[in-house]
C-alpha cells in the first residue's frame, strides 16, 4: 500500500511539474506575440507619420504654385 501511495504521489508531482512547464511556455509565447504586435504597431505609426509629412509637404508645394499662378 505504501508503494502505491509513493507511486501515486510521484505521478501527481510529475504531472504538476509538466503542467507548470507548459503554462510557463504558453506565457512566454503570449509575451512574444504581444511584443511582435507592438513592433508592428510601431512600424505602422512610423509609416503613417511619413505619409503625413509627405502630404503636408505636397500641400505646401501646391499652395505655393497656386499663389504664384495668381500673381
Curated annotation (Swiss-Prot):
Subcellular compartments: Secreted
Extent of the signal sequence: 1-22
GO BP annotation list: defense response to bacterium; defense response to fungus; killing of cells of another organism
InterPro entries registered for this protein in UniProt: Frog_antimicrobial_propeptide, FSAP
Expression (tissue specificity): Expressed by the skin glands.
Major location category of this protein: secreted
Propeptide section residues: 23-43, 70-71
Pfam families registered for this protein in UniProt: FSAP_sig_propep
Keywords: Amidation, Amphibian defense peptide, Antibiotic, Antimicrobial, Cleavage on pair of basic residues, Fungicide, Hemagglutinin, Secreted, Signal
Domain of life: Eukaryota
Annotated GO CC locations: extracellular region
Glutamine amide: modified positions: 68
Coiled-coil positions: none
Stated family: Belongs to the frog skin active peptide (FSAP) family. Cruzioseptin subfamily.
Stated role: Has antimicrobial activity against Gram-negative bacterium E.coli (MIC=26.35 uM), against Gram-positive bacterium S.aureus (MIC=6.59 uM) and against fungus C.albicans (MIC=13.18 uM). At higher concentrations also has a bactericidal and fungicidal effect. Has hemagglutinating activity against horse erythrocytes.
Record's protein name: Cruzioseptin-2
Amino acid at each position: 500500500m505504501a508503494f502505491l501511495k509513493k507511486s501515486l504521489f510521484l505521478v501527481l508531482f510529475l504531472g504538476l511539474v509538466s503542467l507548470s512547464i507548459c503554462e510557463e511556455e504558453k506565457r512566454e509565447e503570449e509575451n512574444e506575440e504581444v511584443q511582435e504586435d507592438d513592433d508592428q504597431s510601431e512600424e505602422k505609426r512610423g509609416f503613417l507619420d511619413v505619409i503625413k509629412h509627405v502630404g503636408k509637404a505636397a500641400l505646401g508645394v501646391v499652395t505655393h504654385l497656386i499663389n504664384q499662378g495668381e500673381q
